[in-house]
Every structure is written in C-alpha cells, then in structure tokens.
Amino acid sequence: MRRKIMIILAGTMFLTAAVAQVSAQSVLMNSAETINQGNLKLGIFPTILFGKNGGDSVWGVAARFGYGLTKSIDIEAKAAFFKGLKYFGADVEYWFLKGENFNASAALGGHITDYKGGGDSKGIDVALMASTRPVKNLELYGGLMLAFDSIKNGGNYTLAHIVPGIEYRVSDDLDFLAEVGIALNDNSSSYGSVGLAYYFLR
C-alpha cells in the first residue's frame, strides 16, 4: 500500500507541474464498466478544445482518480486545466446493466470551475454511458455528457456532448483511451482526448 501511495503522489505532482501554467472541461474517458471493487485508478489525458468560429484550439490536461466501492459502483475525482480555466469535480458511477457483450452505466456528480478574470461557476454533472467489446481487449463506448452550470453573480448555462471513444487493454493494469466530445449546443466546445489509465490492482 505504501508503494501505491508513493506512485499516486508522484503522478499527482507530475500532473501539477505539467499544467502549472495551463488553466478545463471534463472528459468521459471510460467505458460503462466501473472500476473493480477495491482497485484504484489514475488516468492522465492530454486534451484539445477545438476552436469555434475561427478561434484557436487550446491544449490542456485532464485527469481522473477513482476507487471501486462495490462490484457496480465507483467514485472518481476529476480535474482539468486549460489556459485561463481550471476544473475540479467528482462523480459516482453506477453500472446498472451487465450484459454478455453490452454494458450501460450512469454517473452523477458536481464540479467547480475557476476562470481567470472572473466568471467562476459550479454545476452538476450527469452522464449516461454504453459500451461493447467487439474483440478481446478492445471496448467501444459512447456516452451523453451534460453539465448544468451556474455562474457566480451571473446566469446559468448547459454544456452537452455526445462522446464516442475506445478503450484498449494494454495489460491487466494499463488501458489506452481515446475519445472525441461532439458539442451539441453553442455553449459547448468539441474536444479530443487521448491518454492512459493505470490501475493499482488489489
């Protein structure tokens, strides 16, 4: 356990150093299957927010750190950092449909955002996910991701994305993931994200 804690701390320090000058939007970056009970997960995902209306695209980093509470429930902390924007949150995911080759889950959580220059917000996150495994070690997943935000001393807005992605098992404790978030309204920005998730197996 001490070794696991040291690895987690090292990963957290690396993430902090990597994004110290970058300021995020949440990413899905997991299939409908929850983290195995008792296992820890650390995922780090370089992410690009695609520019809109001729604007420049922006690179940043997203991360997820989670724990499998039961065979069907996990909890994950989330963070993301882009220029001028920092995002921190957490959610609980429930794996409610376990089929032979089809799974579905739902997640509910919340977040806060810190915008440089004002406009800080907080909100509720909701996601619905489904996944299937066409071949060994490869999962195809898709999700609907919604965020309902309230701006401090301001109004409300909603972020909405359809998210197709892949999760490939490199080894028992390492997954490669890639996804695209397709914006569904004017408040949202489409994004692309890719990275690795490491599992600290119990």
Located regions from the model:
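Short, surface-exposed coil-to-beta transition loops
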Residues: 59-62, 86-89, 124-125, 161
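Transmembrane beta-barrel domains of bacterial outer-membrane proteins
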Residues: 62-81, 87-93
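Enrichment for repetitive, rod-forming helical segments
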Residues: 9-11, 71, 176
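Cleavable N-terminal export/targeting peptides
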Residues: 1-34
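A short, polar/proline- and glycine-enriched secondary-structure boundary/capping micro-motif
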Residues: 86-90, 187-190
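Generic N-terminal leader/processing signal
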Residues: 1-2, 39, 76, 177
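Outer-membrane beta-barrel transmembrane domain signature
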Residues: 26-35, 39-56, 67-68, 96, ...
